[in-house]
């Protein structure tokens, strides 16, 4: 009889795949999430960029990955640690991306906090160096105007 992998093991496997495919295939993340899943980001304000707003449900999460793929090319995405306590899994790592239009490189530590209910992820909150993102995307003036 096989044992069901822990939420931490499932999250780690999804990120390992994400790194190996260099961000071209987000499907393992969809195996984790429920229909009521919400993805949120520390990036603010929400109208700054598609990646900044909350993404609720599979279709909106697909929009997130499409926006990421449209603008950024993954250089690396390394897992440092995955911690599980109760229904919470925290992924800690680093990533480096090149903006497809500006050519700028953004390297940042990254922390993703996952919340699970009944074996399905219901929420993920991502934290990263937002200034590196804004600089890399050439959006400093837009951010200054929004602030």
What does each model-found stretch correspond to?
Residues 18, 50, 103:
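Generic anion/oxyanion-binding catalytic loop in active/binding sites
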Residues 23, 47, 101-103:
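Short, solvent-exposed loop/turn segments that connect beta-strands within catalytic domains
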Residues 11, 29, 33, 37, ...:
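Hydrophobic pocket/interface hotspot
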């Amino acid at each position: 009889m096989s044992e069901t992998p822990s939420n931490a093991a499932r999250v780690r496997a999804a990120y390992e795949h994400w790194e190996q495919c260099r961000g071209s295939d987000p499907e393992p993340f969809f195996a984790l999430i429920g229909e009521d899943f919400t993805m949120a980001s520390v990036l603010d304000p929400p109208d700054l960029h598609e990646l900044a707003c909350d993404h609720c449900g599979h279709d909106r999460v697909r929009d997130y990955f499409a926006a990421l793929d449209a603008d950024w090319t993954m250089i690396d995405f390394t897992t440092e640690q995955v911690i599980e306590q109760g229904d919470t899994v925290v992924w800690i790592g680093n990533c480096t991306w090149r903006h497809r239009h500006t050519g700028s490189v953004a390297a940042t530590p990254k922390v993703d906090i996952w919340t699970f209910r009944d074996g399905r992820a219901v929420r993920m909150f991502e934290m990263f160096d937002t200034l590196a993102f804004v600089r890399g995307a050439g959006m400093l003036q837009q951010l200054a105007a929004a602030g």
